[in-house]
Amino acid sequence: MLGKIKSDFQQNLFQTRLTDLINLGHPLVKLAQEISWDKLEFEFGKLYSDQGRPSIPIRKIAGLLLLKEMFKESDESVVERWIENAYWQYFTGEDFFQTKQPFDPSEFVHFRKRLKEDGLEFLLSQTVALHPEAKNEKEVQIDTTVQEKNISFPTDAKLAKKVIDNCIKIAEKENVAQRQTYKRVSKQLLRDAYFGHHPKRKKKAIMARKKLRTIGKRLVRELERKLPGEVLQQYADEFEKYKKVLIQERGSKEKIYSLHEPQTACIAKGKAHKAYEFGTKVAVTRGRKTGIISSIKRFAGNPHDSKTLEESLAQSQRVRTQVGGTRPTIASTDRGFRGVTQVETTQIVIPKNTKESSRYKQEVARKRFRARAAIEPTISHLKRNHSLGLNFLKGVSGDVNNALLSGIGYNLKMRFNQIKAQIIHWLEFLIFVLASVFLKINLK
């Protein structure tokens, strides 16, 4: 059952009203007044049952989720900071200053799973609505990046060691008597596999890696022999994954780089400081003039950039039409998207080596592709100041949700900074007027 925040206009002798503590001209207060909380409650209220215990109010949990993404907090830290920050409490709909945690941080996990991709796209559309010009912007810029997964750097030795450890855990859980556990041996072999590039350690490291794989295969076969048929069926997918990890080579297709995140891909973007990144490919779509993100789409594996255009523009259209906007008519990209010139009604513009027919067209193209480079710092902000840089959420749904949430946080932070700039501008204007008046009085 959907819970609601009851507005309390009566004074309380033992509690302090937030409006008596905070500055009502603060940018976060202004931002809270601009967000359509009623629309969020109406849309997300459909996801709750009509029976059972009242849930956490949507204004509270959605507000905290927005604050978390704006200021790059974790599930735990945002709840802790909420207790000590009166502005954050006002943002989430409280009337009086609270001194206890609003809910357990694990509630964020359930809320994200409840919203899914459709709910987060609606939330993204509401952040686009805060920027009226963005929903009808004709030209957008598109680029791809890698959303890295929070996994250990994958090596054959480490993956084989994890397979061995997992087999030991399964044997202990199912009471299977193993001929040998290899706990001590595998630990030493993993150490021997370190620094295999050194000439004096190369031979030893190669032998250690081979031995770890041999032990892993041996333990998997032993479990397949000794486990009962019904139990073996439960672990069938796990054992297939272990076998694939233990036999994959350098040139193997669809390699597994993490046992707990098997969807992780290895992507090379040509960076000098980071040759390979392990995660998922994400396409970012931003407006040319406003800089607002209208689409941030996750893709499985490592598809060619041109293959991401159709779904990215479709998501941008869905997000913008939810707030009365239109589909972009022009999308400027880099040369990595070559091969596509039109996606439905959207023209794809790519830099060409051929000269334009006139000086004017040359200048228009030059300005367009200079402006397109602005998406690079946008991606940098998404990674450094929001959650796109390292994804801690589990599974494919975690990849999708984390990408969308980073875009939501970016759009909100943009509006927050705009409000802050407006306040500073009016203060400067007021100081200028007062200074002019005092100067005239002194001259008289």
Identify what each model region corresponds to:
Residues D95-Q263:
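Active-site- or DNA-interface-adjacent structural scaffold in DNA-acting proteins
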Residues L246, E363-K444:
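Basic, amphipathic alpha-helical segments enriched in Lys/Arg and hydrophobic/aromatic residues
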Residues M1-I35, N417-K444:
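Charged, often Cys/His-bearing segments associated with DNA-binding zinc-finger transcription factors
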Residues Y48-P57, A62, E69-P132:
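Basic, low-complexity intrinsically disordered segments
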